[in-house]
Regions:
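Catalytic, metal-anchored helix/loop core of enzyme active sites in primary metabolism
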Residues: 1-385
Length: 385
């Protein structure tokens, strides 16, 4: 029985992780979990599974829940997340949090000797250098949940690092893949959230529409698989059937195919190196797909993808600033405070304005994150004046 600590249980990845756990009740249990403000979802979860520890965002929610569920230990806030991460009574941390808030729980779990199943992109985008050092120091493993990185992870099995020529990360192109730059000026939040292939959370769906998400995945792949940025390519693939590929030095290309269902990479992260049965609503049928298409990405059409390569290669505080500015700008667009293309302007301006600084400590990351957020807030005020 593998005991999980699930952070971000009420989100898209979190709820699908619970679905995987419920499909294999003899293999997995959940020792503890966290949710944000979705107390309604938490109560539904607690009807399905037994947990001993729960973290919520607000102290008032913690107190109310503690009275309703006396057999559960409740915590709240960032400190509560770190408390869960540090606990000894679990085997694998599943980090499904969204944003920079996911970094410190990952780091603390590693320092406590826990293996990580990672869906939180920002852990590696913002703090990849520190996480890389910690993983080596504490001898733990990191298993990717992102479908693209899971595909690469699977395609690498049985081969050696020196045999890899390049990684090919596929990209659907998001909600606006067929729109021109001119057409993007007036797109709505509702249009941006209508992803053609995947059912995801709101933030990542917007990040997919402007390809910031794919840029994050390039940086993640660099740290996950120790591959230089010049050997990581993005390939447009609108069908989302091939989730990513690995080209080897003999020019063989290994690809992982599957239905666009996140439960598949979630389960593989939980069960590696084994494979368990999985009930999917619609498994992949290649005869229905019939045709697959591929193209090179237009970096002028998707400038945030180019920016991610730039920030990743330079390193230091630039990825943290990029992420922070994007978190703020993405949220502002979803709140209808800025137009869609303003997200790009704000994030690009942040990275090109900040003074480069090396990142040696957690405080360096916190400072970079704060700078990026403050800059983005100022830019948003300028857009609205």
């Amino acid at each position: 029985m593998k005991r999980l600590m699930l952070l971000g249980a009420s989100g898209s990845i979190g709820t699908q992780t619970i679905d995987v756990v419920l499909q294999h009740p003899d293999e997995f249990s959940i020792a503890g979990l966290s949710v944000g403000h979705r107390i309604d979802i938490l109560k539904e979860i607690l009807k399905k599974i037994h947990v001993s520890h729960v973290c919520v965002c607000e102290e008032k929610d913690m107190k109310e829940l503690a009275a309703q569920y006396p057999d559960i230990h409740f915590y709240y806030g960032d400190d509560g997340l770190i408390t869960l991460a540090k606990m000894k009574e679990y085997d694998l941390l599943v980090n499904a949090l969204v944003g920079f808030i996911g970094f410190l729980p990952t780091l603390n779990a590693i320092q406590a000797g826990h293996h990580i199943a990672l869906a939180n992109k920002e852990t590696l985008v913002v703090g990849g250098e520190l996480i890389e050092k910690a993983i080596k120091e504490y001898g733990v493993s990191l298993y990717p949940i992102d479908s693209e990185h899971s595909a690469i992870f699977q395609a690498l099995q049985g081969n050696e690092h020196k045999e890899v020529k390049r990684l090919l990360i596929t990209a659907s192109g998001g909600s606006f893949r067929n729109k021109t730059r001119e057409e993007l000026k007036d797109v709505t939040v509702e249009q941006a959230l209508a992803h053609p292939n995947w059912a995801m959370g709101a933030k990542i769906t917007i990040d997919s529409a402007d390809m910031m998400n794919k840029g994050f995945e390039v940086i993640e792949a660099h740290y996950l698989f120790d591959i230089d940025y010049d050997h990581i390519d993005v390939v447009m693939h609108p069908e989302s059937v091939i989730h990513s590929m690995v080209e080897y030095v003999d020019h063989s290309v290994m690809a992982q195919l599957g239905a666009p269902d996140m439960r598949l990479p979630i389960q593989y992260a939980l069960t590696w190196p084994h494979r368990y049965p999985l009930d999917l609503e619609k498994p992949l049928d290649l005869t229905e797909v019939a045709c697959l298409h591929f193209a090179k990405p237009d970096l002028e059409r998707f400038p945030l993808l180019a920016l991610a390569y730039e920030a990743g290669k330079k390193g230091g505080n630039l990825p943290a600033v990029m992420n922070a500015a994007n978190e703020v700008a993405n949220a502002a667009f979803r709140k209808k405070q800025i137009p869609f293309l303003a997200i790009e302007d704000i994030v690009i301006n942040a990275v090109h304005t900040v003074t480069y600084q090396p990142v040696n400590t957690v405080q360096d990351l916190i400072d970079a994150d704060r700078w990026g957020r403050d800059f983005a807030y100022q830019q948003i005020q300028g857009v609205n004046q």
